[in-house]
Structure formats: C-alpha cells, structure tokens
Design a protein with these regions (language model features):
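Short glycine-rich His-centered loop
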Residues: 3-32
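Glycine-rich beta-alpha loop elements in corrinoid/cobalamin-binding modules
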Residues: 39, 46-50, 55-172, 397, ...
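Radical SAM [4Fe-4S] cluster-binding motif and immediate context
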Residues: 181-354, 362, 375
Length: 486
C-alpha cells in the first residue's frame, strides 16, 4: 500500500505551529524549534519495513508552501494518509480532510494523537476521516491496520471506523525493543533540531511514559500520560538504546542526542548504570553528547548525577512548573519546590547544564505567588551558570480530557469557551487568573538578559560549538519574547 505520513503546512498570523512531538502546542515566532516527531517517524519506518511504499512529508518543519506540499503529496498519490493532530489544530485538520476528500474520495485518511485518543468519535462526526487510531503506540497500530486492510492479520485494538464501530481499548507494546530503529533518511532527520542542541543533533526515545521516585507520573496537566500511556512508563533496554546511538554517531556523524521521553530514563538508576557500561563497551563515551528530559527529584541521589556526567550527558530539561508547593500539590507533581531546587543544584554541581521549564497563569496563584516562582527560576538560572543553561516559560493550558480540564470545568476557571479549540494554541490565557500571565511569561523569558547570566554564559564558552549554541539561543529567545508581547 502507498501510505503518506504528513503534517500539512499552515500558520497563524505569521507564527509557526509547534505540533510535532509536542506535549504543549503553541504558535511561535521562533524558527529555531523543529522537534523530531518520533512516533510518526517510527510509523513511517515500520510501514517501510513491512514492504509498503511510504512518503514522509512534514510541511511545517520543512517550511513548505501549501502548493509545494500538495505537489509532493499528489506526485506520490497515496492510498492512505496519516495525520497527527492536537486540539488547537484539529478543526484545521477536519477541514483539510474535507477538502481533500472532495478532490479524491477514494483516498483514505487516519487521525492519531492525544486529543483523538480521548475523543475519537468527535472527529468522525465533524469530518469524513476514515479511521481514528487511539493511544500512544499509534506507530504499531497503523502498521497493523494497513496489514489488516490488505487482508493480513487482525484489527489492532484502539481503532475507530467510519461505520461507527471500534476495536476496543488500545493496547501498548510491552517490549519496545521489538520496534525497528527509526529510518532517519526516510524521515529527514537532518531538518530537525532546537536552539539548545549542538549540531548535528538527533532525537531518540529511551522509552514511553513518565516515572519518578514515587511512582508513575500523574501530573494533572499532562495529556500524554493520560491519553497515550495509561499512566505507565516503559523503557527500552540499555543495549538497544546504545546500539541506536552508535548507528547515529557512525552513520550520520551526530554530535548530540536528545532523549525526548517524558522523564528520560533517569528515573531508573539500575538502567543508567547498565547504560553507562554499554556506552563504555561500545567506545561511545566522549564521542557523543546526550541530553534528556528529567525529573529533578530523580537527581536528589548524587550518584545519579555522577553517572550521567561520566556517561556524557550535557543538559537536562527539568520541569519546575511553579515555585509554590501548594501549586505542585494541585498539579499532582508528587514533589516539593525544595526537592526541585536541590535536584537542579545537584546536577549543576556535577557540571550538567539545566533548562528549567515554568508555567504561569494558574487560577489560584496571586502576584505574590508568581513572583515566588520568578525568584526560584532566577535562583536556579544564576546558580553556577554555564553556557547552555536556560529556562522556558509558558502559560498553563488544560487540554480536554486531562484531569486539569475537568478541574477547570468543575471550578468555573475557564476564561474562554472550553470547546473553542483554536484558542488553546495562541500563547494567551485560557483560564481565569488574577495575574497578567503574558507579562509574567515575557518577564521570565527576559531573565536570559540578566547581566550575570550573560557574563557567565560568555565566559564559560569553550569552543565553536558553544559559540554557535549561544548565537542560536539568542536568536530563539527573541522569538519567544515576541510570543508574549501584547
């Protein structure tokens, strides 16, 4: 079968949609953010490995015009098309499918993503989509669906059909080692990257799902844990991950790997020890840099920080979310501010760079409380600052289906119609708040302009890679500051 894996291009008032591999969607002015869609890339890989003809076409991150995109898609002439969707753009995707179905009624369309995993029948009612795949392992489900449509195998679980039927609750793949390594050439790996990563960079998933010292992640704002992973966490084996890293280094000259799993693999100390041993065995330590998402409470154990540094980790992306314990409790974060501060400082003590992520605009936080978040963010940013440290700030969003969405409905927190989906992606508050959330986002981003941060970042630059990193970061910062200017 001829299958296309696509992201149709569109923008909003000149801003770029951050759709691929993104837990929180916004439109941004920053052109430096091109996140590699790992599950979509895996879907393309599995289909090709099973003998299907595959077109991978990311019109957003390739910065294609609609005409260029349509020409490439029509030249390929797919029989089946997969789109990843998300709540702020789902109406655009419904309209896209309607338009394309008029042109070619025989071409079949599949929607996957976090929103349709919660609300699969909604897309059937609002568009002529042929199939909706639910759950996070939609790469595996799509491969099985295509085989089924060709008369091979059984219907995968979690698929909704045009006739109103479905195949039941989705299932997750128990052993992620059984999946193929992503075909990087098919999926144009080289076009992706972010300002804070050294070049050439590549993305991987060491697993799927979040976990910390106190159990699986259940943050009430996190749509992926609830829509995709059933509040579970799975890891590939260390040997399997190291073999993929070796391929990326030897075949593509990759200098930095980013693990975009929700909390990386850092919550499992035994896994990290074996990972270090495998990296050493394959003679990869010192030949590639690794960065990762992480939870700060996993870094309270200084031995974990030591292992990370010795293995070649450079930067950790860590969620602070708020500088107030009451907010962390409401969010289900299962940690305290003092633990986050200690974990971040432990990492920096071992020479690891840290990106701290923050959210503002909670309905229950006052100016005093958001100022406390600002002060904690400032403290962490300026603590042992080195080239590569940074932070990011966003306005809290509560996507339909998440526990926070249900909280907002129950407490009348919404400042918009909660079903006015497009407003979830405009970098503006959707929840009532006693503070000016846009102003505070802008203020927190501008901590990068603090003279101490600038001086320490410049003085700690050691090579051309660091200089390029600083340049890209400054360029990206201007876009982010612009996002939150009224």
């Amino acid at each position: 079968m001829r299958v296309a894996i696509i992201y149709p291009p569109f923008d909003f008032e000149g801003k770029i949609p951050l759709l691929s591999q993104n837990r929180v969607f916004i439109y941004t002015h920053s052109e430096r953010i091109k996140i590699y869609p790992l599950v979509m890339a895996s879907a393309a890989t599995l289909l090709k490995a099973n003998g299907h003809d595959v077109l991978y076409l990311d019109g957003i991150n390739e910065r294609l015009s609609r005409e260029e995109f349509d020409n490439q898609l029509n030249d390929f002439s797919p029989e089946l098309v997969l789109l990843e969707t998300k709540v702020p753009v789902i109406r655009k995707h419904w309209e896209y499918i309607k338009e394309e179905k008029i042109k070619d009624p025989e071409r079949q369309y599949v929607l996957a993503g976090d929103h349709v995993s919660f609300f699969p029948t909604e897309s059937m009612e609002n568009s002529p989509v042929d199939f909706v795949i639910t759950g996070g392992d939609y790469d595996v489900s799509l491969s099985k669906l295509v085989d089924y449509l060709e008369g091979k195998g059984n219907i995968p679980k979690g698929v909704y059909f045009r006739d109103g039927s479905n195949s039941g609750k989705f299932e997750l793949t128990p052993d992620l080692d059984t999946l193929h390594y992503i075909d990087r050439e098919l999926t144009k790996w080289h076009i992706y990257g972010e300002a804070y990563l050294q070049r050439p960079c590549a993305y991987i998933l060491t697993g799927r799902g979040c976990r910390g010292p106190k159990g699986v992640g259940v943050c009430r704002f996190c749509i992926w844990q609830f829509a995709f992973w059933n509040c579970s966490a799975r890891l590939r084996s260390p040997a399997n991950v190291v073999n993929e890293i070796k391929l990326l280094v030897e075949n593509y000259g990759v200098k930095e790997i980013f693990d975009d799993n929700e909390a990386g693999s850092i919550w499992n100390k035994d896994w990290l020890i074996e990972f270090y041993q495998q990296m050493k065995k394959q003679d990869l330590i010192g030949k590639v840099i690794i960065s990762s998402n992480a939870r700060a409470d996993c870094l309270l154990d200084k031995e974990v920080c030591k292992i990370l540094k010795e293995t070649g980790f450079r930067m950790l992306k860590i969620g602070l979310e708020s500088g107030n314990d009451a907010s962390l409790r409401r969010l289900g974060k299962a940690t305290k501010v003092e633990e986050i501060v200690k974990g971040v400082k432990n990492a920096k003590d071992y020479g690891l760079r840290v990106m701290v992520t923050i959210m503002v605009g909670y309905p229950w936080e006052s100016e005093r409380e958001v100022n406390k978040t600002y002060q904690v963010a400032k403290e962490l940013l300026l603590y042992k600052t080195h080239c590569g440290d940074s932070l990011e700030a966003n306005i809290i969003s509560s996507y339909p289906g998440t526990p926070l969405f249900n909280d907002a409905l129950r407490h009348n927190w919404f400042d918009i119609d909660p079903y006015d989906y497009e407003k979830y992606g405009l970098a503006k508050p959707i929840l009532k708040s006693p503070i000016d959330a846009e102003k505070w986002c802008n203020t927190i981003w501008k901590l990068h302009l603090h003279p101490v941060f600038i001086l320490k970042s410049l003085l700690s630059a050691r090579n051309i890679h660091d200089i390029k990193l600083l340049f890209r970061g400054a360029n990206s910062l201007l876009g982010h500051i612009k996002d939150y200017i009224k």
